[in-house]
Amino acid sequence: MEDRVNEAIEERKSGNTVESIRILKELIDEYPESGSLHYQCAWSHDASGLEEEAVEYYEKALTYGLDEEESIGAYTGLGSTYRALGKYEKSKEVLEDGLKRHRDRGLSVFYSMTLYNLGETKKAMELLLGQLCDTSSDESIQSYAAAINYYSRDLDRTW
């Protein structure tokens, strides 16, 4: 099975998502409760621009169980897919659930985008600015990190 999964991943990486999906669906027929196969199939659907179809596979992947790395990817993928489909509340719900389970910066950034779409711009900016301060090695950002973090908590405040 591992060789076939690797083949499907390589097909996806080379842009042949149709073949990747075909291989993964065959494997899912053999191993219908494999969270990892459902996750890979969801990813290949997403890479094909088939977001609606990806949702079912992401949901099954999370239901059947994944290792930590794949779980983070599935929460990110599903939350991002819901956002791309305009299902912002569902996106928020999925990403919040993912963030309860995993401390992951990528999840947090996608969550910020969803908050923006929901009009929760203050919270979105606070999260993004915090990520910027925490991850940037740029000296000019780091020299102002304390101020950026302080101001990010209430961007509308004036003195």
Question: Residues of each region from the PLM?
Answer:
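TPR/TPR-like (Sel1-like) alpha-helical repeat modules
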Residues: 61-63, 103, 116-139, 149
